[in-house]
Amino acid sequence: MKNQYILFFRDTSWTKGLSPEQIQTVLGEWKGWFEGLMSDGRAKAGHPLENTGKVISGKKGRVVADGPYAEAKEAVGGFFFLEVESMDEAVAIAKQCPGLDYGAIVEVRPVAAECPAMRHMQENQLAHAAA
């Protein structure tokens, strides 16, 4: 059975210090990597993200600020949505990211079948009912 994972690409400043030609080369490698994953069915979607956005917080979303405010190394610059056999396979794919040699960071996260907070609440209710 295939499992779903998201690769988050972090550190939006990985291009610093690279020439336009070097950036073009890496982006070409990145595109080829993604197209290969799409053609063999392991990647289902993937997109870069804009560097702008909004951050909503506070009760009832009262605070809306320009963002993201994360450090550049923590900011999410894009994602791939994968369907593969295991976390090990997703990690092996992530290790092939062409941006890693230039400071990009790839985070691999499994997609939950249900909200973890909801699952925790249901487990607590079952435990209390059994007590």
Q: How would you name each of these model-derived features?
A:
Residues 1-131:
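Conserved, structured core segments of small domains
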